Amino acid sequence: MKVLLVNGSPHQHGCTYTALAEIAHTLQEEGIDSEIFWIGNKPIGGCIGCHGCVKLGKCAFDDDPVNAFTAKAKAADGFIFGSPVHYAAATGNMTAFMDRVFYSDGCGKGRAFYLKPAAAVASALDQLNKYFTIAQMPVISSRYWNMVHGFTPEDVMKDLEGLQVMRVLARNMAYFLKCKAAGAAAGVEPPKTERAILTNFID
């Protein structure tokens, strides 16, 4: 089993990385592999609604980390997305990245995320969790909000409560993945899916 940890910070080894590294260490203790995927610090454009992903099965733009991540996501069993908070929300790059990752996978019928557990590590939990619920991903919690505090990685290492929250999150993720694997081995089928009913709130 493997969990992809997404570092949405423009700083490769900053505070967000420090939180994800704490999670990775605890996952390893639980027998779960992990990989930290950094989205980089170059500009990532937002979705332009071209619907090229419907035909291609991936985003039409191939000059940034979006398609590379989605390809990795197909083989992953769970996800944790981390982002610093810029103006009460995730970074612009992280938002554009997740918009295109989830939209292109959904429209391209990729199902890289369907029924796979996910969690967000950021003060912008509600914003990031919306991606998971739309993609029908079980959302993994901890014992408090999934966040750490500090201006530097050294500050984060002093946030003992925040680091504990990261460890609890990792153990909860590991527990869910093991339960999911045990259920599959026992013959428990995924829930039946229905064709989406789209309401435009006009008619």
Language-model segments: which ranges?
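Short, hinge-like loop/turn segments at secondary-structure boundaries
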Residues: 51-55, 99, 158-160
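Residue-level recognition of beta-strand->loop/alpha-helix junctions
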Residues: 7, 38, 143-144
